[in-house]
Amino acid sequence: MRVNNGLPPQELEAYGISNVHDIVYNPSYDLLYQEELDPSLTGYERGVLTNLGAVAVDTGIFTGRSPKDKYIVRDDTTRDTFWWADKGKGKNDNKPLSPETWQHLKGLVTRQLSGKRLFVVDAFCGANPDTRLSVRFITEVAWQAHFVKNMFIRPSDEELAGFKPDFIVMNGAKCTNPQWKEQGLNSENFVAFNLTERMQLIGGTWYGGEMKKGMFSMMNYLLPLKGIASMHCSANVGEKGDVAVFFGLSGTGKTTLSTDPKRRLIGDDEHGWDDDGVFNFEGGCYAKTIKLSKEAEPEIYNAIRRDALLENVTVREDGTIDFDDGSKTENTRVSYPIYHIDNIVKPVSKAGHATKVIFLTADAFGVLPPVSRLTADQTQYHFLSGFTAKLAGTERGITEPTPTFSACFGAAFLSLHPTQYAEVLVKRMQAAGAQAYLVNTGWNGTGKRISIKDTRAIIDAILNGSLDNAETFTLPMFNLAIPTELPGVDTKILDPRNTYASPEQWQEKAETLAKLFIDNFDKYTDTPAGAALVAAGPKL
């Protein structure tokens, strides 16, 4: 028996994994590098070395999350608290699973992992020691261990010595469920959670993001019940300690816009907001790389080096990367430890209370302005609406931009009813005197996407206060307050009507989008608080 770094096999046997004879426990980056490039590896386990020093892997047919294969055990722990897909008006991915089917899936995964050489990574989710989850990840694939080492908070040697996992993630990517039809499931693949056992099981999908977003869903369950905001957002802090958070769905610009040489990064995707301020859940970043260039996004480009892990990019024979090639997926990605970005909050990824709250949307209709300043009611309305365009490739089967409404800019990861997140966020914003803004990083009447240069200038105007002092006019139908001019921004684009050949073209599209907003918000009108917010939305 050869056990690395002293994790006793009995610890894994307690989860149902048998015949444990080789554990690679909390492997170093150097060891993972050797393992991933082992010439004997085949299929999706195999890594390829790129000219930038980072290893690249393929995740197979799953190049994004598979929300239709997500299940939560419905039992006494979750029955009355979880936001269930089969109850109420709201649409979500929290499909109930019986304890019996859970046991069957657990058997599949533990049999898959039994008798194998296993990688075990112990890490934290959450930078606040009072509320963090201690998570143990178990996988037979080296690069999956590398992914979680990048993405979660790496414990010190001292913390590892006393590490007691609160949550177990068993990744059996190589196994599938042949009995899925009889069990009434979506497919042979599964991503299942049990809050009583505090465990996640993965089968059939190799996509690393299932482990990252799985733990985000769990934080989204545990923290708001304690009055702590749990947010699908990036965050950064200025020289004077001013904190900004950027909400948005995948591909709307959270990572790009929060990675700013003038400000220190707190994190790029998942945060909490408690009595002390804003804190990161993660220890790394997961950036989209499609059409990445050193000129447009130097910080992210320079983060792609040894210890970073690329997913689904095209690597040429000579090891160079074609970042423009989306033939495998538009959702090409790189994970890297957060310290690959030079300008970060140290030693712990947390800061004070946020004073600027930015909602990012990628409007495929070309109706919304590039920026508007929201009232308190509009803040709640647009947070609960969570409008964007679903961008290509972040979920399976989506290749063209399509409009979507995702509550709290992250409905796929919500474990409680959206109004619970809105209540906690509003409470935190009011206490901090925070102001919210809606920023469209999508399209306008030209048919082109608003440039990163213009969007960055808009973000600068929000953060330095010049937008708050700007003269504004009101966009009809949506009743949004828009600045008449901003430094460094082409004035013609501020009013979206000006980007069309005629204002009637905008009007026609605006009516279509306004109706979608109104129809979507109907699901919140069954409470007095929700009904009161209707006035903050568009009017036909």
Swiss-Prot record:
Protein keywords: Acetylation, ATP-binding, Cytoplasm, Decarboxylase, Gluconeogenesis, Lyase, Manganese, Metal-binding, Nucleotide-binding
Pfam families registered for this protein in UniProt: PEPCK_ATP
GO CC annotation terms, alphabetical: cytosol
Cofactor note: Binds 1 Mn(2+) ion per subunit.
Record family assignment: Belongs to the phosphoenolpyruvate carboxykinase (ATP) family.
Nucleotide-binding found in the keyword field: yes
EC numbers for this chain: 4.1.1.49
Pathway involvement of the protein, from the record: Carbohydrate biosynthesis; gluconeogenesis
Subcellular location: Cytoplasm
GO MF term (any one): ATP binding
Modified residues (N6-acetyllysine): K87, K523
Matching PROSITE patterns: PEPCK_ATP
Residues the entry annotates as binding Mn(2+): K213, H232, D269
PANTHER family in the record: PHOSPHOENOLPYRUVATE CARBOXYKINASE (ATP) (PTHR30031:SF0), PHOSPHOENOLPYRUVATE CARBOXYKINASE ATP (PTHR30031)
SUBUNIT field: Monomer.
Tagged with keyword Metal-binding: yes
Catalysed transformations (reactions): oxaloacetate + ATP = phosphoenolpyruvate + ADP + CO2
Sequence positions that bind ATP: 213, 232, 248-256, 297, 333, 449-450, 455
GO terms, biological process: gluconeogenesis
Protein name, UniProt field: Phosphoenolpyruvate carboxykinase (ATP)
Cofactor: Mn(2+)
Binding residue positions for substrate: R65, Y207, K213, R333
Organism taxonomic ancestry: Bacteria, Pseudomonadati, Pseudomonadota, Gammaproteobacteria, Enterobacterales
UniProt superkingdom: Bacteria
